[in-house]
């Protein structure tokens, strides 16, 4: 009986360690997926951005919030998650299917979904009871407004090729910022369960 109890205790301790399945660490895989998504977005370029200069718009990327030190660790994870979720939602539509090479678009959506899946394993552990407050956080509201502006712009421009090209370039900026945020979270310790 003592042996079984010792074995169970050891199993619990290992589960919560860096190599355990219950710890919530930002993995190297997450960063590799992020880089691959940026590479795919770059390959999706169909038009010269210079030919679409008349369609340029400042969407108000909250770059200083994402890349600066404004976010606390408990805010950084939900912001990262929301940015990836909104990016996925933007590209996983009928309108985007008509605008892009289907293979590249599917690969991008799969890559974004893989990042979200990895973060989903952490989400419940990190957010816990705070999840109900997620939609009320100012940084989350800022991210949602940013993406709503992108959706509104596309609709206003009739989902034209130039509008999508402007959005593609903007999404490269946004995903680069989210990658910077991932790196910041990793520097904060990577373990999203710690304070």
UniProtKB/Swiss-Prot annotation:
The keyword Transferase does not apply. It is found in: Secreted. One of its GO terms (biological process) is defense response to virus. CDD domains: IFab (cd00095). PROSITE patterns: INTERFERON_A_B_D. InterPro entries: 4_helix_cytokine-like_core (IPR009079), Interferon_alpha/beta/delta (IPR000471). It holds the Pfam family Interferon. Constitutively and exclusively expressed in the mononuclear cells of the extraembryonic trophectoderm. GO terms for cellular component: extracellular space. One of its GO terms (molecular function) is cytokine receptor binding. IFN-tau genes are intronless. They evolved from IFN-omega genes in the ruminantia suborder and have continued to duplicate independently in different lineages of the ruminantia. They code for proteins very similar in sequence but with different biological potency and pattern of expression. Belongs to the alpha/beta interferon family. IFN-alphaII subfamily. Paracrine hormone primarily responsible for maternal recognition of pregnancy. Interacts with endometrial receptors, probably type I interferon receptors, and blocks estrogen receptor expression, preventing the estrogen-induced increase in oxytocin receptor expression in the endometrium. This results in the suppression of the pulsatile endometrial release of the luteolytic hormone prostaglandin F2-alpha, hindering the regression of the corpus luteum (luteolysis) and therefore a return to ovarian cyclicity. This is Interferon tau-7. It comes from Ovis aries. The gene is IFNT7.
